Curated annotation (Swiss-Prot):
Species for this entry: Bacillus cereus (strain ATCC 10987 / NRS 248)
Enzyme class: ligase
Motif ('HIGH' region): 31-41
Binding site for Zn(2+): 29, 209, 234, 238
Family designation: Belongs to the class-I aminoacyl-tRNA synthetase family.
Residue numbers carrying Phosphoserine: 270
GO cellular component: cytosol
Protein name, entry field: Cysteine--tRNA ligase
Domain of life according to the entry: Bacteria
Database matches in SMART domains: DALR_2
Amino acid sequence: MTIHIYNTLTRQKEEFIPLEENKVKMYVCGPTVYNYIHIGNARPPMVFDTVRRYLEYKGYDVQYVSNFTDVDDKLIKAANELGEDVPTIADRFVEAYFEDVTALGCKHATVHPRVTENMDIIIEFIQELVNKGYAYESEGDVYFRTKEFEGYGKLSHQPIADLRHGARIEVGEKKQDPLDFALWKAAKEGEIFWESPWGQGRPGWHIECSAMARKYLGDTIDIHAGGQDLAFPHHENEIAQSEALTGKTFARYWMHNGYININNEKMSKSLGNFILVHDIIKQYDPQLIRFFMLSVHYRHPINFSEELLQSTNNGLERIKTAYGNLKHRMESSTDLTDHNEKWLADLEKFQTAFEEAMNDDFNTANAITELYNVANHANQYLLEEHTSTVVIQAYVKQLETLFDILGLELAQEELLDEEIEALIQKRIEARKNRDFALSDQIRDDLKDRNIILEDTAQGTRWKRG
């Protein structure tokens, strides 16, 4: 089974054929570290971490690079407002970013380059573009000469005439063409700066990724990915810079994830309708947030609501409960049944269907459907009069493998005896107060944790299922 990826560049699904056999070079645009990330910012790390995990599962050696923009207009503004320097703020939010995405199940990239640690190669990249006539200096700023790059607009599928019609030169800009964009910005008084052939300043946003991708992955990479909002102008400009310099294809497959909406409106810091990751993971299990995100195909928008999150949690708990039941039954199973082959063959079908979903442009939504199928099938098997450790181990291993591919964990902390007794006492009090809704909720919650209650004349008894 081959993997097919929807390529934004061609607007169609294409068979994935890496440049080097069994190796994948992948670059994912990382955050500008001036604040905590919101759940919209967190979608790309989760999506493309899952892509990476699946590629590794299929046997590829993945070189995964994701950068930090640690100097930028937003960082300078934050520094001025807080009375701190830019490096202090950047360091704080790099650490916060790692805490958030690690909680969400994301592995660290092979390399997490920072702009400020790669200034030499960025300046060198700009100088090479100037030398080739693709860039020009203007009063300390350096701009990319867009009209010199023939393919400009090919990623966003916009004719250059249309782009030029909608572009304008802002006050203070010294560029020759409205479509030209900054590679280097002259420092204003009091701003952080680096020395360069054009004077003191700092790089523009777009050049940073081109330079770091080239340094760590080479002139041509397999997959370049990021949020949908980066396709234009950021990724369009990356293509122009990189291909103008090298004369080679910059990235062969372009992947972009959809937005997260709140009440059908794009989540963003500028609109003020965002939910910070470090806040929501205090309220909900981070694994649930990831499961929720992956329940929708990565190219589709997600409309976030607590109702949808709760519904997703119910589904996740069903799978975890099935897994817990399998683990408990493993101790008491025998090998008396002779129907092992049928159940194992069905498991193989679920595995195949899961991989078919992931091979189809990493369709995690359909892949998760197969997780539900495995869990439901396991529950049916556990109703058999005799069960086999061979089959149960196969169910357990399959669920663990598929969850690991998606960056999820199945382990559920077992309730202590004292915790169970405390919940039973709370249920008894609820029944005395005729709060039958609470009583039923406690019973159902315990059942989900594989604790069976039995109400008798002598009181409530319990056992582990």
